[in-house]
A protein has these predicted regions:
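Residues immediately within or flanking Cys/His clusters that coordinate Zn2+
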Residues: 14
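Short, low-structural-confidence N-terminal segments
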Residues: 2-5, 18-158, 162, 412-430
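Charged, solvent-exposed helices and adjacent loops that form client-binding or oligomerization surfaces
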Residues: 123-163, 167, 179-276, 299
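Second-shell loop/turn segments in exported
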Residues: 99-105, 149-165, 174-185, 228, ...
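A generic structural signal for ordered secondary structure
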Residues: 17-22, 304-312, 370
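PPIase-associated folding chaperone regions across multiple families
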Residues: 33-38, 56-96, 212-300, 327, ...
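Peptidyl-prolyl cis-trans isomerase
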Residues: 307-353, 383-384
Length: 430
């Protein structure tokens, strides 16, 4: 299965995506929220009401749930459901932008910075899951605080807020540890951050904004500033790149992979993975497509194939040489910028001629060939084969160790979120 947030491949039992650090499979912190009531408190004409007025006033200030009887005077928990709606006026968003709403170790998150995390979650969802939004009847142009998420309890605003806080929590924890161990960003990323203000100013001008500040306020809400956005980018890149550096070093041994599979053999079997499931193969390809489905067009396409074949055979015929030709000639938009790579191909994934070549007996790394499918001609380069059970166990084990990595880093820093102080400004979406 894949993470619904970053699309990374994850094990079906995963609770946290090792790539982005978010909770998956719909797992959420247990929640139970009730409706916030408002009350207008005035001076009572009957002296006996004054004590009740004081109680109600204190309740309003401290987050007590108000109702029509004393049974409703219960403290509302400082959690995601503290407010039915976190939306406030632009004036209040600006006034409270520097209020600290969360801390982790020595790091602080302000309302202004939270705006960035929140709206980035919304924009990412709209961009990547627009079809899902339609099927869920989510109208992102309407008030998200009045639309219920799929669990039947949480509002979409609360869902995105929780996602935003989890994103900050994960990135900030790794950014803190990166600072402690003296990790430095790769030069290209540091240069990007150093020049971010200037680049944002250019982007703002292109989009018709008077300044980068105006652009940020329009995109992230009235309570957000350019400084808030650049702070977000610094934490995001530092935390994410440090995490990916550590994650990339996870390299379980063959014995660990075998032991992990054996320990979870029942779970893998439920997914149809056994030690007799066959192989995955990785191949690179160069696709040349005919201009039309006619005999003349196919002949012209074959002529272009011969040109590429000649260049291939005149090279040293290494994988690097193949990569060069992929970049120059491949018409497969999906793989052209990844070296023409298809990974984890299983039987049944491709058209018959393509598949027969990939799974031919005694196929070896470095083998190459030419096949024709309904898409066109494919010049193929065989990279490797791996037993499906081994590949799935290795992936699952790396993800498990990645979750342990995330949990271990998060455990080092005390987290405190004050939902009572959180406010969100509106952004016009259409």
């Amino acid at each position: 299965m894949k993470c619904q947030f970053c699309n990374a491949k994850i094990h079906k039992d995963a609770k946290v995506c090792p790539a982005c650090g978010k909770r998956v499979n719909g797992e959420k912190i247990p929640k139970a929220f009730s409706q916030m009531k408002s009350a207008a408190i005035g001076v009572g004409c009957i002296a006996g009401l004054s004590a009740l007025a004081v109680v109600l006033f204190i309740a309003m200030q401290t987050g007590w749930d108000l109702g029509s009887s004393f049974d409703w005077l219960k403290p509302r928990a400082n959690d995601l459901y503290y407010k039915d709606s976190y939306t406030v006026s632009d004036w209040k968003a600006k006034y409270t932008r520097n209020d600290v709403v969360a801390t982790m170790g020595d790091a602080q998150l302000t309302n202004g910075q939270l705006q960035v995390y929140y709206w980035m979650q919304v924009y990412e969802f709209v961009e990547n899951y627009s079809d899902t939004a339609i099927s869920l009847e989510l109208d992102y142009t309407a008030d998200l605080a009045k639309q219920i998420y799929t669990d039947g309890k949480t509002t979409w605003q609360q869902f995105f807020l929780e996602s935003a806080l989890e994103m900050w929590m994960t990135n900030q924890a790794f950014a803190l540890q990166a600072q402690e161990v003296g990790y430095t960003l790769p030069a290209a990323y540091q240069s990007y951050l150093d020049n971010l203000d200037a680049e944002l100013a250019k982007d703002a001008a292109k989009l018709g904004y008077a300044s980068a500040e105006d652009m940020i306020r329009a995109e992230m809400g009235a309570g957000c500033s350019l400084a808030d956005y650049t702070a977000y980018m610094q934490v995001y890149y530092t935390g994410y790149l440090y995490f990916t550096d550590l994650y990339g070093k996870i390299n379980p041994t063959e014995q660990e992979i075998s032991d992990y599979f054996d320990a979870n053999v029942t779970s893998f079997a439920k997914s149809g993975v056994t030690k007799t499931s066959g192989n995955y193969v990785d191949v690179r390809h160069i696709l040349l497509v005919p201009s039309a489905d006619t005999e003349t067009a196919w002949a012209e396409c074959r002529s272009r194939v011969d040109t590429v074949l000649q260049k291939w055979q005149n090279s040293d015929m290494t994988e690097l040489d193949f990569l060069v030709l992929v970049e120059q000639y491949s018409q497969d938009d999906i793989t052209a910028y990844t070296g023409g790579m298809y990974t984890n191909i299983a039987k049944g994934d491709m058209e018959e001629t393509f598949e027969n070549w990939c799974f031919a007996e005694n196929r070896q790394a470095g083998d190459w060939g030419l096949v024709q499918t309904s898409y066109g001609y494919h010049l193929l380069y065989f990279v490797e084969a791996e037993a499906i059970w081994h590949a799935e166990a290795k992936t699952a084990l790396i993800q498990a160790q990645g979750r342990d990595l995330v949990d271990g880093v998060l455990a080092q820093y005390a987290l405190d979120v004050d939902y009572r102080k959180i406010v969100l400004a509106e952004v016009e979406m259409g």
